Swiss-Prot record:
It comes from the Bacteria. Functions in the biosynthesis of branched-chain amino acids. Catalyzes the dehydration of (2R,3R)-2,3-dihydroxy-3-methylpentanoate (2,3-dihydroxy-3-methylvalerate) into 2-oxo-3-methylpentanoate (2-oxo-3-methylvalerate) and of (2R)-2,3-dihydroxy-3-methylbutanoate (2,3-dihydroxyisovalerate) into 2-oxo-3-methylbutanoate (2-oxoisovalerate), the penultimate precursor to L-isoleucine and L-valine, respectively. The modification N6-carboxylysine is found at residue 124. GO terms for cellular component: cytosol. This is Dihydroxy-acid dehydratase. The active site is at residue 517. GO terms for biological process: isoleucine biosynthetic process; L-valine biosynthetic process. It is an enzyme of class 4 (lyase). It comes from Rhodopseudomonas palustris (strain ATCC BAA-98 / CGA009). Its cofactor is [2Fe-2S] cluster; Mg(2+).
């Protein structure tokens, strides 16, 4: 039977000093012997998805104490990708994921905590905490701050549900008046919470449900709704139970690596494909799997993408459908239920709240459940009042969305498409693969071929789009923006948004070794691996070349002869130390980002660090 980790600092004569310090934090004699639970919060006033978390850590802490544990809260950093977007601030977003994972490890191991509740929400925070949970492998429960309500705006006499991306596109559309743009801006983000569509933050919070590490509703119940409070309360009780089961009952099944095993990662990726999640989720699931020491790779994602249909389309893939609509249709448990009925899930996987995923679906899938409380839970609705306060309203829809033929969530027989919402493409320009969010690609451009216009920075591409140098039929290539080449693998939300504002969203392709925001739609292909900075073929593309894309057959190719590519490769290598670097780009790369670039790996590996490669260790 494993001993409580915290005994290292709470027991024995030689720990008198440590106990003295614990006492100074409020612990009493009766607390030495209880599980010490880390409450890992991420409150910040910089990020709307986290601005309401300040008191929620203490809410969880009080519930932990009521259940017989000792709670100790600390904070991680949190970057707002939307505010960091479109300038050098975005260089720091993906690297912050590693800092978050490390900071959790540092705090939990330095203080010998026995278990943890991870209070996350936005883009890199949930992945960073997930990586830490898999790395530490102590009992853990995830609870997110929840999605924000979709904005509502009246334009030309019609009411539309809007979000951040709509405001960005409107601002770049010269046909929109300043007044309408300002109306859109003021309406797009009305409440606290993670941005309202199936963007990266909400995608990841949904995936924790499929991994079995969070409670039902974690990904979909609104930040402002009173029902979300129950998740925080239950997280506090659940983590104490898990800690006791492991340390006192010798039940290792409650550990993150045994819950989120290979089959659970397959379930999560299956959900991701079915709901058309953010392409960033591929990076983060690969990274978390690596921390769990699982051999889960791009090949597995490719395999799953060929058999899983698209069962839901949510903003940005379609307008007027947001997370509040997904919740009304039964949330993530409803999508998992449809996948189960299609024979696409392994329901024997365990969860932090149920013996198996199958048992969880029997209670929480609204097509199976007979529970009136479950149906009431999924009728939670937006309040329609601007608010930065959690649990500030308790409005409910009159009815659930149970339409599985034409509703927000479809059954397999009425899927939006036979192919799922994400796909892996391979070809000479992406030998290790690249990712496209097919749920956001118009059917007319699933196959596409066009002349290339090459840019070695996002800024140059944006300038070309806004000055009308990109025309229908073009393939825009942005390179040297990968994990190492950026460094930091910037998101390309501005280029894709500006293409839409110019009416080119269905007429152009954008290819990059960088990545895309969860808010991106259109023929946007990212994570091209190997990246240009590592000698990838994308570094040899020239203006006027043609690139052919065939999503149904999962291929992408640079239509240039092997002899010509070999010649270009020799010319590039002849540049010496300057080889495989951008020719004219001026970018201030800080020491912190240089350190990240030295240790990071390919997007095909989740852009995780490889210390062994850098220092030559086996």
């Amino acid at each position: 039977m494993p001993a409580y980790r915290s005994r290292t600092t709470t027991h024995g004569r030689n720990m008198a000093g440590a106990r003295g310090l614990w006492r100074a934090t409020g612990m009493k004699d009766s607390d030495f012997g209880k599980p010490i639970i880390a409450v890992v919060n991420s409150f910040t006033q910089f990020v709307p998805g986290h601005v309401h978390l300040k008191d929620l850590g203490q809410l969880v802490a009080r519930e932990i104490e009521a259940a017989g544990g000792v709670a100790k809260e600390f904070n991680t950093i949190a970057v707002d990708d939307g505010i960091a977007m479109g300038h050098d601030g975005m260089l720091y977003s993906l690297p912050s994921r590693e800092l978050i994972a490390d900071s959790v490890e540092y705090m939990v191991n330095a203080h010998c905590a026995d278990a943890m509740v991870c209070i996350s929400n936005c883009d890199k925070i949930t992945p960073g905490m997930l990586m830490a949970a898999m790395r530490l492998n102590i009992p853990a429960v995830f609870v997110s701050g929840g999605p924000m309500e979709a904005g509502k705006v009246v334009l030309k006499g019609k009411t539309h549900a809007v979000d951040l991306i709509d405001a960005m596109v409107a601002a770049a559309d010269s046909a929109m008046s300043d007044e309408d743009v300002q109306t859109m801006e003021r309406s797009a983000c009305p409440t606290c919470g993670s941005c309202s569509g199936m963007f990266t933050a909400n995608s990841m919070n949904c995936l924790t449900e499929a991994l079995g590490l969070s409670l039902p509703g974690n990904g979909s119940v609104l930040a402002t709704h009173a029902d979300r409070k129950r998740l925080f309360v239950e997280a506090g009780h659940t983590i104490v139970d898990l800690a006791r089961r492991y340390y006192e009952g010798d039940d290792a099944s409650v550990l993150p690596r045994n819950i989120a095993n290979f089959k659970a990662f397959e379930n999560a990726m299956t959900l991701d494909i079915a709901m058309g999640g953010s392409t960033n989720t591929v990076l983060h699931l690969l990274a978390a799997a690596r921390e769990a020491e699982l051999d889960f790779s791009m090949k597995d994602i490719d395999r799953l993408s060929r058999r899983v249909p698209c069962l839901s389309k949510i903003a940005p893939s379609v307008s007027d459908v947001h997370m509040e609509d997904v919740h009304r249709a039964g949330g993530i448990m409803a999508i998992l239920g449809e996948l189960d009925r299609a024979g696409l899930l392994d329901t024997s996987c365990t969860t932090v709240h149920s013996e198996t995923l199958g048992a969880a679906l029997a209670r929480w899938d609204i097509r199976q459940s007979n529970s009136e409380s479950v149906r009431t839970f999924f009728r939670a609705a937006p309040g329609g009042v601007p608010s930065q306060t959690a649990f500030s309203q308790d409005r409910r829809y009159d009815e659930l969305d149970l339409d599985r033929e034409k509703g927000v969530i479809r059954d397999a027989a009425h899927a939006f498409s036979k192919d799922g919402g994400l796909a892996v493409l391979y070809g000479n320009i992406a030998l290790d693969g690249c990712i496209v969010k097919t749920a956001g690609v118009d059917a007319s451009i699933l196959t596409f071929s066009g002349p290339v216009k090459v840019f070695e920075s996002q800024d140059d591409a944006v300038s070309a789009i806004l000055t009308n140098k990109i025309v229908a039929g073009d393939v825009v290539v942005i390179r040297y923006e990968g994990p190492r080449g950026g460094p930091g693998m910037q998101e390309m939300l501005y280029p894709t948004s500006y293409l839409k504002s110019k009416g080119l969203g269905k007429a152009c392709a954008l290819i990059t070794d960088g990545r895309f925001s969860g808010g991106t739609s259109g023929l946007s292909i990212g994570h091209v691996s190997p990246e240009a900075a590592e000698g990838g073929l994308i570094g040899l593309v020239r203006d006027g070349d043609r690139i052919s894309i065939d999503i149904p057959n999962r291929t992408i190719s640079l239509d240039v002869s092997e002899a010509e590519l070999a010649k270009r490769g020799e010319e590039e290598r002849a540049r010496g130390e300057a080889a495989w670097t951008p020719k004219d780009r001026k970018r201030n790369v800080s020491a912190a980002l240089q350190a990240y670039a030295m240790l990071t790996t390919s997007a095909a590996n989740g852009a995780v660090r490889d210390v062994k490669r850098r220092f030559g260790k086996n």
